[in-house]
């Protein structure tokens, strides 16, 4: 089965075609992504109106390019899939309406995909990973620990009770006068810094619950920077290194407890695995810390290629293909959802968490 996927949930416009065979193995035929960093950089963050307009301007030609790169015509794909949420509502509307129109014109089945499910299933595309496994999703809009039991069967073990990790990176960068996007900027500066200079907090470390918290760490960074004004270059690099070390320790504590819980629930699992996805998963220091953690616990550490960790349409096409193998198509009447939890059975987190894109 060949599926055309479309992703427009935030500030990347993307189209891709993925093939899934009868054995459940996947192959990416094309994967086109257009970033909007240049459009949003002057504002220090994503502006929803600008993002939606940029999607409108770019999406048609990206779909054409994805088809051309795959050597296919629209009528030769077997289904169309698009992100229906969560995300910025303007961008979701652009992608969803385009995908519906293409599906209707070509008389192909349509699948509305949860963006988080795309991240959750990427390791099955890249590594053929069997169920069950653990997913750590770390991005600008999410920080979640998820147990993936099967297609559509997800249990949220932990989530952020305030800021997403990617947002904490971006806010730290902004406090220190670093360029947008903040995550890569903080990582670059941290390489030159002393991570032991500042004793920043490790929120919720040692607690039994598996939730995350980063607002206190962000506040500590602000207080530290304020006390040092005017900041020297060495101050900035040391704050970045100390911040990144605190994040690595916090993730290791939360994830370590999740690995122990997984082994208790699935003692006979032959291939216990931790998958890390989302834009923050591109951070090499955090990857190394989590990989070492997995080695100590006897887990395989799986991080998709960097271009598949950040937002892309290949993961959306693949999620559509996985669902198409066992589920009926979605109605063309389906509406976009700016908020759409992957695990709809778990109690929602009220009054906390990111209030913005893909919250």
Curated annotation (Swiss-Prot):
The keyword Zinc-finger does not apply. CDD domains: ASKHA_NBD_TsaD_bac. One of its GO terms (molecular function) is iron ion binding. InterPro entries: ATPase_NBD, Gcp-like_dom, KAE1/TsaD, TsaD. GO terms for cellular component: cytoplasm. The keyword Metal-binding applies. GO terms for biological process: tRNA threonylcarbamoyladenosine modification. Gene3D superfamilies: 3.30.420.40. Substrate binds at residues 137-141, 170, 183, 283. NCBIfam families: gcp_kae1, T6A_TsaD_YgjD. PANTHER family: TRNA N6-ADENOSINE THREONYLCARBAMOYLTRANSFERASE, TRNA N6-ADENOSINE THREONYLCARBAMOYLTRANSFERASE, MITOCHONDRIAL. Required for the formation of a threonylcarbamoyl group on adenosine at position 37 (t(6)A37) in tRNAs that read codons beginning with adenine. Is involved in the transfer of the threonylcarbamoyl moiety of threonylcarbamoyl-AMP (TC-AMP) to the N6 group of A37, together with TsaE and TsaB. TsaD likely plays a direct catalytic role in this reaction. This is tRNA N6-adenosine threonylcarbamoyltransferase. The gene is tsaD.
């Amino acid at each position: 089965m060949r599926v055309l996927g479309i992703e427009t949930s935030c500030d990347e416009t993307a189209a891709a075609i993925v093939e899934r065979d009868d054995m459940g193995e996947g192959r990416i035929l094309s994967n086109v992504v257009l970033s909007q960093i240049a459009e949003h950089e002057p504002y220090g963050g994503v502006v929803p109106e600008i993002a939606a307009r940029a999607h409108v301007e770019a999406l048609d030609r990206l779909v054409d390019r994805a088809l051309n790169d795959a050597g296919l015509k629209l009528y030769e794909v077997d289904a169309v899939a698009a992100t229906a949420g969560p995300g910025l509502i303007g961008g979701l509307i652009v992608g969803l309406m385009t995908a519906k129109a293409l599906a209707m014109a070509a008389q192909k089945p349509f699948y509305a995909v949860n963006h988080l499910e795309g991240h959750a299933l990427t390791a099955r595309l890249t590594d053929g990973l069997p169920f069950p496994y653990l997913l750590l999703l770390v991005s600008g809009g999410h920080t979640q620990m998820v147990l993936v039991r099967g297609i559509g069967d997800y249990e949220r073990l932990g989530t952020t009770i305030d800021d997403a990790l990617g947002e904490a990176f971006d806010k730290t960068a902004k406090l220190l006068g670093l360029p947008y996007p903040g995550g890569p900027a903080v990582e670059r500066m941290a390489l030159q810094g002393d991570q032991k200079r500042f004793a920043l907090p490790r929120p919720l470390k040692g607690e039994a619950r598996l939730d995350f918290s980063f607002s206190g760490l962000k506040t500590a960074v602000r207080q530290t920077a304020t006390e040092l004004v005017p900041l020297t270059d060495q101050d900035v690099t040391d704050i970045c290194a100390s911040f990144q070390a605190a994040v690595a320790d916090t993730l290791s504590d939360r994830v370590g407890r999740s690995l122990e819980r997984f082994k208790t629930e699935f003692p006979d699992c032959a291939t216990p695995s931790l998958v890390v996805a989302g834009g923050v998963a591109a951070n090499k220091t955090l990857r190394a810390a989590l990989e070492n953690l997995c080695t100590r616990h006897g887990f395989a550490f799986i991080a998709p290629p960097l271009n598949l960790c950040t937002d892309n349409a290949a993961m959306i096409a693949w999620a559509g293909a996985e669902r198409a193998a066992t589920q009926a198509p979605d109605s063309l009447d389906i509406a976009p959802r700016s908020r759409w939890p992957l695990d709809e059975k778990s109690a929602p987190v009220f009054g906390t968490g990111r209030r913005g894109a893909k919250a």
